[in-house]
Amino acid sequence: MAVSLFIPLYAIAILALIPMLFAKRKIGYCITAFFTGLLTVLCGFYFCGSAPNLFNESQKSYTESFRSLVQHMDKTYVLKEWKAVDFAALEAKYLPAVQTAEQEQDAVKFMNAVQEFCNELHDGHIYASCEIGPEEEKQSAFHQHEYGLSMVQLDSGDVIAVCTAEEVRKLGIEDGTVITQWNGKPVLQAAAEDVPDYGIPVKANADRIAPMYLSALGGDTVDVTFLDKSGREQTVTLSDLGECRTAHEAMDAFSHAPKFETPEDYQTFLDQNFSAKMLDDKCGYLILNAETLSSDPMGLKNIAGYLMGDQKYAREIFRTRLNELKAQGMEYLVVDLRNNMGGFDEIGCALCDLLTDQEWYGQGLGIRKNGQYTCVSDHGVHGTGEFKDLPVVALTNYNCASAGDGTSLYLSKLPNVTLAGITDPCGCNQETGGTCVLSGGVVTVGYPVGLVMDETGVPNVDTKADRISRNPVEVRIPLDLDAAMAIFRDKKDYELEWAVQYLEQ
């Protein structure tokens, strides 16, 4: 869940203009001035209540700002106890690298240390935003190379080449070729030992995509061992072809991720939210790529639903979409949550309202004090029963995060809904709001400070230190050779095709 901390400030600025419209009307001016003042005070209190989690350490040195970051997170990171985080141990582990970066005045080394520190927490809501150029990026510990292929692990355990370039195909490695070694190591061993920790919350998700990351790791050259068409091992040396493209292409194909190359692409993605259509004469299709109302630019409807625990506006949109599909002959439905960017869990609950006639616990908003959790507001699913008998498959993946993670969980509780995917949801759903700007503004770290709990009083989705998914898919979509070729070579939406076939059967 991501609630913008600055919406109250925007609201205050706009509210201040309202009395001007009634400047020549004595009664109207008094009334609007009173309510404007009241709303301004409320918005001010809301912002001030959030402000303690904003920390500016930009005037301090690398070492001092890093130590301050650790202290702030030790006090305010909402999942410190849940994930059993030892901040003192992490500070001791990464402080030498930070001190070296300070001695050498090396911003990239500082960035690396902070990023690796953040990744140790395995929280999808923790980020380290870094201000570096393309040349500095090449020195990053997370720099990726381009060797003209990517790799994916099948359910069988085999690792195959995908998205192969012409330079690689000439050497005998084609889409579907089994890769056995990477730079002299068994390929899965190399994926486990050499791929950096990217902070992915669910370890099973990280393991699944590790070969894709591995395909971009090496030096100016990399030795790749594969099985030729006769089944014999061959080894070739691949050269770095420049800027990394293939690994990104493979990840986009695997997650069915949208392209964000232009502002128009991003707007198209947002415009698809809440959209619906018929895939055939029986199967409806609903996209939910963010739990926000794009028709609400000020965010007031979003916030109203959050505060009231009831998103009536979203529920009415869902009701309209589903009734339109029903009128076109819908007998079953696919809800697409893949790459869901999150927002407000109440929107996910509003969809569930229509798909059940039962009462279900949704989320509990709480506070953390002295390492203890206290729930202060319960939000739930209040079934209307309108589509309680509609068979539904909800597609999710490792890029479905935050409120999308929550929506995956809530939908999976309904008996007529099957949560499915090749991977599990991301594994994070706490409220963001903690921000710390480090030395010189080189790195800004964000992390969650608001608590979202389940009915037992613990974080509702987020993984513990074991990194085991707590809202796994109910049905794992198979990934065999044919599926991989459909995804990576033919660029088909294999998961969606699978979902339709599943519902038909």
Report the location of each language-model feature:
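C-terminal "post-core" interaction segments
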Residues: 5-6, 10, 19-20, 26, ...
